[in-house]
Amino acid sequence: MPVADVYVHYVNKVERKDRTEAELIKVITWLTGFDSKTLKSHLKKQTNFKEFFKAAKIHPNAKQITGSICGVKIIEIEDPLMKKIRYMDKLVDELAKGRPMEKILRSGL
């Protein structure tokens, strides 16, 4: 599945909660290590999740992302690709719920 197919839903979700696409991009680039140009290139090329995360340099503080997403505890996810996808889902949820950006980006933890 292309990341772009899900990205549209991420944008809709955060904008419904009065957050911006720019904030969404900041969250995703923090997690993946991509700059916004590279992220947009992956979206335009319809890169699938496997290739998207294969190219990413996951932020070292991503391990601090905890909790549940879709009823599944992140710490219990064994598949590395699925864990990265759920990290991104969790960050988007936190953004949509109005959590401060410095907490979403695990600054000062």
Describe the residue ranges of each PLM region.
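A charge-rich, low-complexity, intrinsically flexible signal that marks solvent-exposed coils, linkers
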Residues: 1-109
